[in-house]
Each structure stands twice: as C-alpha cells, then as structure tokens.
Amino acid sequence: MNKLSKFALSCSVGFLFFFSLNVVSQEVEEVVVTATKKAESVQDLALSIQAFTAEDVSENMIENMSDLAEVVPGLIMDKGIGSGASYSIRGTGSYGVGAAVVGAVVTASNGHSYNSSSIADIGFFDVERVEVLKGPQGTLFGRNAVAGVINMITARPTAEAGGYVELEAGNLALAKTNMHYNLPITDSIRTRLAFTSKKRDGVTENVNTGNMFNDVDSWGARLSMDVDIGDDSTLKFTYETYESDDNRNNIGTSFCEPHPLYGCSPFTLGTPNTAADSRGSTAALFNLIGALNYTADKNSYEGAAVVDTFKKANLNREPIHQQTADFATVEFNHEINDEWSMVAKYSYATRDYFHMNDNDYSVAVQPFPGLIPTTGIPMSWYGCFGGEGYGFCETVDSDRTYEFSVVTTDSQQGEITFISDKDGPVNFVLGAYTLDSRNNNRYQIQTASWNMIAKAVQHPYNVPVFGGALTGYGGTDFFLAMVLGAPASLAPPGIFALLGLPKYEVPTDIQGFINEDHVRSKSMAVFGEMYVDLSEVTKLTVGLRWNDNTVKDSVASCLTFFSCPKYPLSQKLTGEYGFFPTQVTESDDALAYKLAIQHDLSDNQMVYASYTTAVKAGGNNPNSTGTPDPYAPEETAVFELGTKSILMDGSLLFNAAYFQNTTDGMLISSIVEAGSKNNNVDANIDGFEGNAILFLSETTRLDFSWLAVKSEIGDFSLINPLNPNGATQLLSPVINADPQGIVRYAVTDAGVIFKSAGSLCLAPFNPAGGVPCSNPGILTDVTGNQLPQSPELSYSLSLNQDYNTDGGVTTFRLTYRYQSERFGDVFNSERATMNEHKYFDTKITYQPNDANWFVSVYGKNLANDQFVGTWAAGSPLQGGNTFSTYTDPRTWGVQFGTSF
C-alpha cells in the first residue's frame, strides 16, 4: 500500500471515528442529480460527484467556471492561447493544443455538450443545479469524458406566475442583474424567461495609454417552455443567447528574463510584462529583410518600460474580446408505460468569437534605423493589421506584435434514451447519440516587419530612394531578393526584371503567421447501463458504450509566403487571401465500459468499488507547415473505492473516494517552431478526495472538500524547445556568424547552440538561406515527472453561522481555499512552477422572517493577492517567453434580491 493509500485510509477512519460522537444539529439535505440520465440522490450513486443546488451556487458565490474551480478542489479552469479554455479534474485534463483537439472534460448544459470556452464566459445564471462528475464518464457522456463532466442544469418553468430579481453593485463600478419570470400560458403550457447582465470596469491599467482594461461587458438571456402533451408526455424547449464585447484578457501577461541568445532565459522566469530580447528572433530577421534595419542583431525592446505587477501593463493597444453564443435544445419526455420511459433530445449551438491581443506585452521604444541609416529617412508608415472584416490601421514606427483569433462554430447533437423502472432486480438505461460539429478557427500573429513586407508601396524608401519603383510589389520573395540577394549596382527595376519576380502584394490576412483550421467532427454512439440488485443491500452496475468518431481536419499554416508551400502563384497575383488546406481525416471506434458494485452498510452508509473507462478521439496536430501529423486516441481507466455516508442522526455528510487513474496516450503539447505537437504520453494519477458537511448545532455548519493527488508521467522523452541541449549557463559571449547577425551562436555548458530566425539548433543552419536545422535538440527524459496543472493538495473549508432574531436571520460565511504549488510544464522546471494559492472569501446575508427579500454583502480574495493561473510556453521564434493568466484582485459588493 503506497503512502497516498495509507493517508486516504487513515483520514477516512479517523474522520468517521471522530464524528461518531453525538452532536445536536439539524440534518443535511441530499441533492438529487441526473448523472445517470435519471433522477437519483448523490448518496445512492457509485461515483464521485459534487453537486451544487441554486442555493449552494449563491452561497458559494459561484458566478462562472473560474468560481467553480475555486470551490471544487482539483478542478482547474483557465483560458488558453487562441480561443479555447483548458480544464482539468483530479489532476488530469486538457493538455493538447489545436482546433481539432477535444477537451478531456465535457462541459454541458442539460446533458448536451456546450463549447467549453463559451460556457466559461456565460457562467451560471438561473440554474437549478451544477453537477461535477469526477473521473471517466465514458458510458453515458461519451467521446471525450476521460477526466469528468461539468453539467449545468437550467431552471424549468413552474405552474405559478411570478419572478425574481437580484441586483448587485460593487467595487470596480460593478453593476450586475439576474432575473427570471415564470408565465404559465395555460394549465399545460409554462414559460420562463431569464436574463443576466454584468458590467465591470477594468482591473489592469495600460501605462502606455492610461486606459483601464480587463473589464467585463456582457449579457445573456434564456427562454424555457414546457408543454404537457396528455398525461404521459412533456415537450421541453430551451433557447439561450449570450453576448460579450469588452477588453478582457485572454492571456494576461508574458514573463521573461531577457537574454541575448535565447530571447528569454530558459534558466529563470523573469518578470511579467517583459518582452523578449529580439536579437536573432523571427521579427529581427524580417526587420532586416524588410529593410527596416541593417542587422538582425538589434534588440527593439531595449529600454522598454517594465511594470512588474499584474495590476498594470505596457501595451500598444488594449485587448479586444467579443463573443456571441446561442444554444437551443428540444427535449421530449414520454412515459411509455409503468416500467419504461423515453427521452429524445436535440440541440443546436453556434458561436462567433474574436479577440485581439498585444502579443509582445510591451511597447518598443527603439525606432527602426532603416537598411541605410545614413539617409536619415524616418522609418514610419501607416499599416493595417488583422484580416478581412476585422482589425485596425495605425502609424508604425517601432516593433510590435499582435495576435488575432477568429472562430465560428456550429454543432448539432441528437440523443434518444430509454430508461426502465421495473419492480424486479434488473433495470436499464439504453440509448444512442450523434454529434456533428464544424469549427473554423483562424489564429494569427502579425508584426511590424511582416506588415511592411506585405506591401512595399508603404516603405519609406519607396519614393525618395527608389522613385516609386516598389509600388505593386510585396512578399518575402521580393524583399529577400531586393535586400539580401540583389547586386548592389543594379537599379531596382532592373533587379526585378533580372530576377523575373512577379508583381503582387500580400493580403492583410496572411501578412505574418496564420494557422487556419476547418474541423468537421462526427460521432455516433450506442450506450447502455444495466443495474442489478444482487440483494436488498447490494447493487451491480454494468455499462458499455461504443463510439465511432471521425475528424476531418482541413488545415493551412503559413509564415507569410516565406513558408507557405501550397499557396499558388495564381492566388498571389489576385491580391486576395485564399484557403489552400491539407486535408487529414482520422477515424476510430472504441469501447468504453463501467463495472461498479455498491453495498449498503446501513440505510445511510454505502461503500462502492468501480472500474470505469473512457476514450478521447484522435486528431491532427496544428503544425507550422500544414502537413498531416495525426495523434492517437487517449484512453483512460480508473479504479475507485468510495463511501457515501450520512451519519450522526443526519448531521454529518461524509463522501470520500480513493482512485487510481491510468491513462494511455494522454495528450501533452510541445512547441515546435510556429506550431504545436500533441504527444501521446502514458500517465498515472492516484488520489484521495471527498467532501463533508457537518452541522455542529442548529445554527453552525462546516463545509469541507479536498483532493490529495499524486501524478506521474510514464516512460517518455522529448526535446525542450526553449532549452534544446539542457544547458544551465553560457560559457561564451554571443557571436554573430555573419555580418548581419542572421545566424548567431554561443557556447553553453552543454555544447554549442545556434540561433536564426528565432529557431534554436545544435548544428549550423540558416533558414533564410534554405539550410534547415539538422539537430533540433537532445531528448529530455520526463519519466516520473509530475503532470502539469496537477497540485498535490487542494481544499476548501467554510464556516457558516446563522444568527436568529425576531425579525429575521443573518448568515455569516467565511471560506478559506488552498491550492498547493504546481508545475506548468512536463519538464517540471523551476521557472514554470506556480506558487500556492490562498484565498479568504466572506459573505453576510440578512433575510427577514416575514418578507421575500434578502440583502448580502460579500468580499472575495480579501487579502487582495493575485496569482498565476496557468502557464503557456511561447515559441522560440518569439523568444521563448512564458505566457500567463492571472487571477482577479479583491472584489466586494452588495446584493439585493426579491421574489414576486
């Protein structure tokens, strides 16, 4: 028995023994959930689940997924690079990158998948319940539920007319509204309209412009209708829409310790809001190619202001964040007879997403000197960034890097389920499910030099030096020939004719790095669970699901026309952007199953053991060349021992589980040049988790939930793209291998390392000259390392105290939340270690005895500490910085709610 197993057993036995004493108290309430496609108490289910009623959601101040992650130990949620969101449960989650990658955690609304990024923004308004199912849920929830399910169950209409409104105001000019209204039309038709809106000022100051950003401006609405069709059938309709338009962060900042060779030191983390040393980077090379500089050995960010705090930033522009999402569901419930019922469900969802970030997280103060500094011509022009239908234009006189993400998705799901309720010992849930989704995802990085290279007409040298001869030309082929390859004695028109270069300009969409991914995903499944009462106190569950998944990935990646092999000359000559993808189709089918046995020790105590599996579909890697590079499916199996207990005459709820998770082919992403590669890695995760509710008296309650987990990567090695030879220090100064600094190198304590166009190599190379890298690095053994985003300990402890008076009840709640330090990469490097998180939250609510209103005051993050949320490694092409999200500062406010 390992240490974690002994710890789990000791805690369980000790906890139950300690609280076997009598405590005068009221009884805990059981929560009814639909985790098995039918209504059952949490206490009767042989699986680990935390469920929050509408009252729990309000009490815990769970407004969105980020709040839920604070309340549920081991649940980690954060935004990712691009348009996505990453989730992990129990120390395992979504470590893959790319539009074709499905998450390891299913986020759902009323049982059907909901885009994980959309639901993170929308949050929880007018909900009946939020269920967090931990561990594989492959038999009932399908193709990617390898780590768990987060299911939001929305409130349904009632038979009585009436409504509720809640108003909230707080610091940062917070103004929030939640309301709903029930309107029965007839005895058999009921409707409910819910609405939410939130506005909040920004929490971060841009010291360059003086503007505040990272604000919130969003609203959402939901229409629900239930129609009784006879005595045995009900038709349920739900339509939800959401919109946000603000300047909130996607990725919050960039950490870097500027380094003359690497860009950012791979040895130390550095400070936030710090740009990489641009010498030898992709941007520096293209500054030279674009005739904006006479060398690639120049740091554009030397002398740039650094603000070492999350509360401030130094940006050319504040971020833009826009999202609209719609989700509609039609559900038909029919009682076939006394023993069988049927549920047929169809849902349709759409999403439009856009964001723009200042990707270098700094403002360069070094002007461009030009290819010929002696001319004295200012290097300044008016350039446009973005793409067709989005973006902006501005005066450009120094380095800058912008990021754009544009996404449109639509999906439809259909499901039919048959549920038995027989008097005999055997019952069933049987069903079929289908999914068809389309995801068009565009991700772009654009710099000043790439903007210049797109259209030579905007170059400051065009008229005074070349007499306008550059007009109509553009692209890397032209600029490479003009700057690096042409005889100096020839006039420009003669050079172009001699080289036979075609005349075209580069569309704004492709003036930089662009990865455009059109993903079509189809999934079909049949599933079922059988429940066998072996005796009055023992129950066996057997589940099985067959999935058939197909992912068609049409992907095109270009680094301007410098690396864009499939883009034809005929399209270049049109001056318009075209999509010329490589198509990859990955198909696989898989079985997932579940075996569970549970035994009632008494009416209020149950123990169980289960073995469950789930499979996540394979796909294609988003590499920088757009070539096919598939990855395999991810298969997870978990053995779990647990208990569900209500003790001490109903005053104590104690649920706990010990689990052993084995995953074959877990996706671990690594940066490769401008793209990403998802590696299939084996991993093991052991953990002990649980939650307890204890009434110490009629007016005093303790809530405690926890997770202790140990994760370990299996036998695997990969190249560290930020430190390819595993060096710990430089032993020589950085040396230019050519007069223009296109190729640079230095001696480290692990050998010589070369750099050009941002790429690192252990052998001489020159991407601009057509000489590729022959030795990209030495494999680093990560066997036995801890998984990223897997803190070893996290818990939440709350004290609830009611004060009763003749006029009403005042409830005081104080919560302490803790999460131990964790690693942000598979190398478990010190620079990627995230510090422990500690929060205190409080809420005080008054509710009169003879009225239907309440008033609350609350404070979150009382110590006003801000922590790193997640890490995301930047590409060496940009200098190897570390992107980071960060948590909100202290917030406080007042709430008033009333029903009518």
Outline where the language-model segments fall.
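Acidic, small-polar-rich N-terminal luminal/periplasmic segments of exported/outer-membrane proteins
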Residues: 26-160, 641
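Outer-membrane beta-barrel translocator/receptor signature
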Residues: 102-104, 116, 125-134, 139-221, ...
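Solvent-exposed loop segments that connect transmembrane elements
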Residues: 204-212, 249-314, 360-404, 446-514, ...
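Structural signature of Gram-negative outer-membrane beta-barrels, strongest in the C-terminal barrel
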Residues: 228, 418-421, 427-437, 466-467, ...
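Surface-exposed extracellular loop regions of Gram-negative outer-membrane beta-barrel proteins
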Residues: 245, 253, 405, 438, ...
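Membrane-embedded beta-barrel scaffold of Gram-negative outer-membrane proteins
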Residues: 331-337, 341-347, 352-357, 600-616, ...
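C-terminal beta-signal and adjacent terminal beta-strands/loops
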Residues: 439, 445-454, 702, 711, ...
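Gram-negative outer-membrane beta-barrel transporters
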Residues: 536-540, 657-662, 679-826, 895-899
